[in-house]
Amino acid sequence: WKFKNFIIKKLLLILCFVPLVSFGQEIKGKKLFSIKAAVGEWQSSVGEYLNLKTIYAPYAKGVFDGIAKGKVLPIGGDYPLYYQENGKTFSDLDIDMVLLTEDNEKIYCKASGVFNYVTETFESLKFQTHWRFRTSSEKYKFLNDVMGIGFGFVLPADSEYNFQHDIYDVHLK
């Protein structure tokens, strides 16, 4: 009987850990873009929706590099919904952006995400985004199938840009 208990315990232990070993999935990714953007004259109170405030922050200029280099066209911007609580701002981002590559190809970018920060200092607490791309360019048409993951950064006050987005194509191995 002791031997059977021992075998049953070993089998249960193996059954518990086999899924972790055999079905564990790994992800891989590559960096697509680093985008630096400057916000132009923004409107502080466009309206409210479900007790959330909204603003419009247009992009005035920007640059990017990675799989291509170029500039951010002064089209689109960010239309976040946000609320403030206990000295912090919690934002739900809604970004529209058009990139123009050095080889004159346009890439439309749409992103959503979160940007939470200390209201008084603009210190970033969380800045993550999800990106989709659209282009008619033959060279970059693979981007139409990419769902990018972005990590954002607030740039120093003396920079000519306000924000940086590092965007990765992440998928299962």
Task: Locate each region found by the language model.
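Sec-dependent N-terminal signal peptides
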Residues: 11-20
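Beta-strand-enriched cores of mature, soluble protein domains
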Residues: 25-173
